[in-house]
Every structure is written in C-alpha cells, then in structure tokens.
Amino acid sequence: MSISLLGRIVSQQFSGIRAAGPGRSLYLPFTLLLKQPGAYKVNLHRYVHSTQTKSHLSFLMNNNDITPFQKFTVKVLKEQCKSRGLKLSGRKSDLLQRLITHDSCSNKKSSVKINEPKKKRILINDPIKITKKLVSDKTFRTIEKNISSLQNTPVIETPCDVHSHLQPRDRIFLLGFFMLSCLWWNLEPQESKPTIDH
C-alpha cells in the first residue's frame, strides 16, 4: 500500500475538522482527539500581509528605457545610484528610496522654469569717430602725468648712504657697552672660585 492511499483511507474513516482558510481547506489527522465531547471547533487561519505583487513604480534608465523595479537587482540599483552620484551602501530598499527621491527631485527641478531676465543689447547706430588729435592729446597727458609723478617722489636716503662714519653719540654708546661687558667678564671668574674656610 502506498502512503498516499493510506492517507485517503484515514481521511475517509475519520472525518476531520475543516480548517477554514481564504481558499483552502485542510483535514487534520488528529481529529479523533478533538471529537470528544466538550471539544471545540478549531479554525486555522493564515493571515498574510497585503503586499502588492506588482507595482507600477518604474525608473527611467540611462538609456531612456522604463523598467519596473521588481526586475532590478542590487547590482543594477548600485549602478544607477553611481550614475546619479548617490551613496552606494545599504539595502535594496535604501537604494530604491534614494533613486526615487533623486528622480522625484530632478523631475521637480526640470518642471520648474527659471525666468531669466533677457540681456539688453546696446545697439550703437553711429560709431564714435576718434581723431588723431584726441589720441595724441590723451597720450601726451598720461605720459606727462607719469613723468611729473616720478619727479615729485621724495628720495629716502638710508643712514648707511648718508653717514659712512660713526657719530659721537654712537661712539659713546659702544664704548660704554664694551666697558660693561669687560667688567662683567672679569667679575664672573672671581665668583666661581671656591673659598676655603678654616
């Protein structure tokens, strides 16, 4: 006897309690225990979250093809993020969210027109005529100003150029400095000599 045939015989002899589900029924083989007086009817339900199997969300790929997001792999999502300059780490849902927000922001930016003020063109009907006299006057004046400004600048003389010898006050300062350093140098060896006390 095969196992499937044995299962049918058992299910026919012992009618089980029907487990009501959203489209399926199931006969449980342990229903003899539940048929005792006082046993209650058992209903088994399978609750499944209501996620849509298909979504109409799509992305515009680089080559302008529209592809639904179910077909995207993590590798393709990372390539899309890289091409848009977005962060590459995270889960598939994070990558999708980044792409969605980036695409929605770029669509908003492209739909908003920026009204730039038109550049005004200045049209000159009559060109300005310049005579040689105007050019020569202008050139002469600028050269003249440059020459006069060079002549009026004061020349600063450095002390080395003016005085090649020492002044009397400089001699006094150097002589005093030399004497103080000699005194200090002579006093130092005397202080360092050990004194012997008897």
UniProtKB/Swiss-Prot annotation:
Entry keyword Mitochondrion: yes
SS bonds (residue pairs): none
Main location: mitochondrion
Keyword annotations of the record: Membrane, Mitochondrion, Transit peptide, Transmembrane, Transmembrane helix
SUPFAM superfamilies in the cross-refs: SAP domain
Pfam families to which the protein is assigned, alphabetical: SAP
Protein localization: Mitochondrion membrane
Transit pept. (range): 1-55
GO cellular component, one term: mitochondrial membrane
Membrane topology of the entry: Single-pass membrane protein
Top-level taxon of origin: Eukaryota
Domain spans labelled SAP: 69-103
InterPro entries: SAP_dom, SAP_dom_sf
Transmembrane segments: 172-187
Family: Belongs to the AIM34 family.
Protein's recorded name: Altered inheritance of mitochondria protein 34, mitochondrial
Protein's organism: Saccharomyces cerevisiae (strain RM11-1a)
Lineage: Eukaryota, Fungi, Dikarya, Ascomycota, Saccharomycotina
